[in-house]
Amino acid sequence: MAALGFVGGQGMSDLITMDDLSNDEILDILDAAERLLPVANGDVYAPLLQGKVLGNLFFENSTRTRMSFESAMKRLGGEVVNLSSVGSSVAKGETLYDTMQMVDGYSDIAVIRHPRQGAAQYSADAIGIPVLNAGDGAGNHPTQTMLDLFTIRQAHGTLEGLNVVLVGDLRYGRTTHSLSHALVRFGAKLTLVSPDSLRMPNEIVGDLQSHGADVAETENFAGSIADADVIYMTRIQKERFPDEDEYTKVAGIYKMTADDLAVAKAGMIVMHPLPRVDEIHPSVDSTQHARYFQQAFNGVPTRMALLCRSLGIEVPKEVGE
């Protein structure tokens, strides 16, 4: 279906990193996602993507990202074809290049998650249809960042000048890599909480600071709660560790309970890209601060807006009318 003329490779309709979006584009997409909330909830039917096919390619495990993209496409009237490394020719040794050629012919747009950093850009360069990066190893996860920004703005009414605390696996956590770059563009103050072995990579911290970002690094989680507007918890990603003994040393190092939040601002929100292991005790779920389940749902309207953008479909001001 590449003959339809959608732009791939370095084209503007791809989303590989947050650098592919200007601040104005970010805000426009969030506005579109807001208008699409009734569609995501199933209250309004808006077949904006009728006749379009999404190729959903997941070479790593996923629940929320895969399902929310599928829900987003179908609620907008589109169709989805799914591919994973199990049960496809990938298991027979087919190269990523060859797989992407097939997707180019079967779909109008592709979403890819892959364990290799850079795989999303490689795929975008290889085919003509738009490609959305759903996570490339320890690299980037821009569609997660967009739903995170949507959730933050939903709670605070703005993205400007917030105090954001990122906690946990900041070395391998692609969600925090993408989110930190986006937040500093809106003047956020970042506090990076991690054990020394899981610090945010130096090149990322250096890049943030070179753009004038206010970035502090610490291992003290408890001391970072009181001033936070957002606390973004992450799990320690066992699958990224080359040595299980190294994982064991840091597993469970940060655990949030409801009691920890006694010093928090009333409007502070707790986020998590999920799945959680033991970083957030279930006692937090019923507090006014918990936003992680709403955050996960917000993947549907946000990814609706991203699909429409990449396919050149305008989201009307009054959806469903």
Task: Explain the meaning of each model-derived region.
Residues 2-31, 114-142:
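Helix-enriched interaction subdomains in cytosolic or periplasmic regions
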Residues 3-71:
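Positively charged, low-complexity intrinsically disordered leader regions
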Residues 8, 286-321:
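C-terminal helix-to-coil terminal segments
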Residues 41-43, 47-153, 278-280:
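Phosphate/diphosphate ligand-binding glycine-rich loop within oxidoreductases
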Residues 59-71, 154-233:
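Glycine-rich phosphate/diphosphate-binding loop of Rossmann-like nucleotide-binding domains
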Residues 76, 106, 126-128, 186, ...:
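Short, structured coil segments at secondary-structure junctions
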Residues 206-284, 289-290:
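Rossmann-like adenosine-cofactor binding region
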